[in-house]
Amino acid sequence: SMPTALMQHYLSTWEEMAADGSQFEMTDITVRGVPMRVFKNAPPTMRAFWELTAGYADRDYIVYEDERFTYAEVAASVRSLAHHLRDAHGVGSGDRVAISMRNFPEWVMTYWATVSLGAAVVGMNAWWTSEEMKFGLNDAQPKVVIVDDERLERLLPVLDEIRADVALHVMSVRSDRDLSDNCSRWSDVVDASNAPAELPPADIDPDD
């Protein structure tokens, strides 16, 4: 069938946007033996994408209730956490860090710190029960799980069972709950006011 006027408009717009020399120019590459069509000018990694936000340092990035964080403030926490994950827990390319919390600002900070190390984020359903959390953590085998107070309450009863299979470190966010061995508090290890000036070096391939 003939394209509608609206469809023709979208097609011509896309052709203009993806034309040679444009920001959204397309190119053909082979990824692990599979031919793919990709954006020629896309950032090569999520770390590179995050680093592009440095130009917006003083702008608000996250607003949570009465809390506001600029890009620069978030970036400082990201650098601090990334160095801690690498230095204290050996997190690097190919490793996994799990996140189990409501939509706190720390969720986003953990995401960027993790991918900036070349590690994978394991996003866990915040509604999961203790048994579901145990299954997910045993299946994903992360080095670290970062949890808020509600998720920590569900995790603690099954933590010993999980650790029978996974050498798991637990980091709590916005929680005063007593912690067992091999646990830490975000507030004790993430220091945005004294963060390193740069992210840790990381060897990340675009296809990781």
Predicted segments, located by residue:
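AMP-dependent adenylate-forming
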Residues: 25-30, 47-70
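Conserved AMP-binding/adenylate-forming core of the ANL superfamily
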Residues: 41-42, 58-112, 129-134, 138, ...
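Structured binding elements
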Residues: 118
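Conserved ATP-dependent adenylate/AMP-binding module captured primarily in the ANL superfamily
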Residues: 128-158
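Conserved helix-loop-beta element of the AMP-binding
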Residues: 141-143, 160-174
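Conserved pre-ATP/AMP-binding loop-to-beta segment of ANL
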Residues: 184, 194-208
